[in-house]
Each structure stands twice: as structure tokens, then as C-alpha cells.
From Swiss-Prot:
Lectin and alpha-amylase inhibitor. Acts as a defensive protein against insects. This is Alpha-amylase inhibitor 1. Belongs to the leguminous lectin family. Heterodimer of chain 1 and chain 2.
Length: 246
């Protein structure tokens, strides 16, 4: 009787711990048309009448940021696990000068609060330095050259992925109209760079000079995160532990 009670107590404690460990929040959304309820708009960012996210005005010295309306969990401090994520968006950058003009458009993961622990992770589509780069806390980790004029005024498809198992951070940019593409990938240990919750979105600046401004639109956006390691490892461990308990 005492042995049976001990087993039941062990099982109850294990299930309680497992329930706590499963508390990581996964996120998935698809936005085909933006509105002010699914975004947090800052600076000059606005939503057009046809549902496009406009990150800069049709003029110089315009700066803005736009984030998904809810924070997203990227790391689980209880386990130390980091989510894998996959995000896709369609963007349109239009320059108004043949030479390098403004700064470009960034995809960003930033701490929910400025004083929060964790760095900013950025994918830069830099039109001034003509490069696509993966940055952590303003440090260029990996970059490749690109020519914005291969995409100028045309809808470009972007895919950004992070695999928490391999720690590979990948970026691909393509122009369906011309077949042009650019790709960059590198290893990033996100568990050392980010804290649990981040704001995910975009930032852009149109340029400091009237003769060299550019506009930046995002037409659609999808995002999904999953604690792959967390679930797979727990499922395997739970079966082993339950067998031992029972």
C-alpha cells in the first residue's frame, strides 16, 4: 500500500513538472492584408487602403517600425530551449535614384522591453551598402552582396528560418518576375542572444536626402514558431520516466 502511494505521488509530481515544462507558447499567423489591429505602428508606419504595410512616406527622412500586435516567445527559460521559426513576407522597395539611396528595410526581433535581457536580432536588406546581412546586437554575423535594382519596384519574396536543432539561421530573397535570388545562412546560438519574449516585425528608413529617398512596403506576412526540441525530447523522456514509475 505504501509502495503504491509512493508511485502515485511520484507520478503526480512528474505530471506536474511535465505540465510546467510544456508551458512554452508557440505562435502562428498569416496576414494577407494588414490592419491597425494586427500591428503596432511606430513612426511614419501606416496601413494603406488596400491593406499594405507602408513603412515610409514618399519623401525623404521618413523612419518607422511595425510589429506584430502580440509578443512572441522565442526562448523558454525553464528549459533553455529556443523555438524554431519560419517567416515569409512579400516586400516592395522602390528607389528614386539609380545610385545607392536610403538604408533599406529590416526584419527584426527585439526585446519586448528596452531594459529586458537579450539582444536585437536583425536581417538587413541594406540598400546603401548593397548587402543582405544577419546581425546580432548591431554586429554583422554574416552578409552577402545584393543589388536592390534587381528588385526595384517589384514584389520580392523573402523567407527567413531558424532551426533550433542545427542552429542554422537562413535568409532567402527572390524575385519571381526575373528569377533573381540571393541567399545567406550562418550559425547563431539564439539561446545565448535572446530572452524569452520578443517583438517581431519590420523597420525602415527612406533616406536623409530629398534626391535619394525610397519607399518600403510589406504586402503580406506569415510567421510560425515551434519548440521542436522541447516536444520531441519531452515525449521521449516522459515515456522512459513513466515506465520507470509504473
Amino acid at each position: 500500500m505504501i509502495m503504491a502511494s509512493s508511485k502515485l505521488l511520484s507520478l503526480a509530481l512528474f505530471l506536474a513538472l511535465l505540465s510546467h515544462a510544456n508551458s512554452a507558447t508557440e505562435t502562428s499567423f498569416i496576414i494577407d492584408a494588414f490592419n491597425k489591429t494586427n500591428l503596432i505602428l511606430q513612426g511614419d508606419a501606416t496601413v494603406s487602403s488596400n491593406g499594405n504595410l507602408q513603412l515610409s512616406y514618399n519623401s525623404y527622412d521618413s523612419m518607422s517600425r511595425a510589429f506584430y500586435s502580440a509578443p512572441i516567445q522565442i526562448r523558454d527559460s525553464t528549459t533553455g530551449n529556443v523555438a524554431s521559426f519560419d517567416t515569409n513576407f512579400t516586400m516592395n522597395i522602390r528607389t528614386h535614384r539609380q545610385a545607392n539611396s536610403a538604408v533599406g528595410l529590416d526584419f527584426v526581433l527585439v526585446p519586448v522591453q528596452p531594459e529586458s535581457k537579450g539582444d536585437t536580432v536583425t536581417v538587413e536588406f541594406d540598400t546603401f551598402l548593397s548587402r543582405i546581412s544577419i546581425d546580432v546586437n548591431n554586429n554583422d554575423i554574416k552578409s552577402v552582396p545584393w543589388d536592390v535594382h534587381d528588385y526595384d519596384g517589384q514584389n520580392a519574396e523573402v523567407r527567413i528560418t531558424y532551426n533550433s536543432s542545427t542552429k542554422v539561421f537562413s535568409v532567402s530573397l527572390s524575385n519571381p518576375s526575373t528569377g533573381k535570388s540571393n541567399n545567406v545562412s550562418t550559425t547563431v546560438e539564439l539561446e545565448k542572444e535572446v530572452y524569452d519574449w520578443v517583438s517581431v516585425g519590420f523597420s525602415a528608413t527612406s533616406g536623409a536626402y530629398q534626391w535619394s529617398y525610397e519607399t518600403h512596403d510589406v504586402l503580406s506576412w506569415s510567421f510560425s514558431s515551434k519548440f521542436i526540441n522541447l516536444k520531441d525530447q519531452k515525449s521521449e523522456r516522459s515515456n522512459i520516466v513513466l515506465n520507470k514509475i509504473l
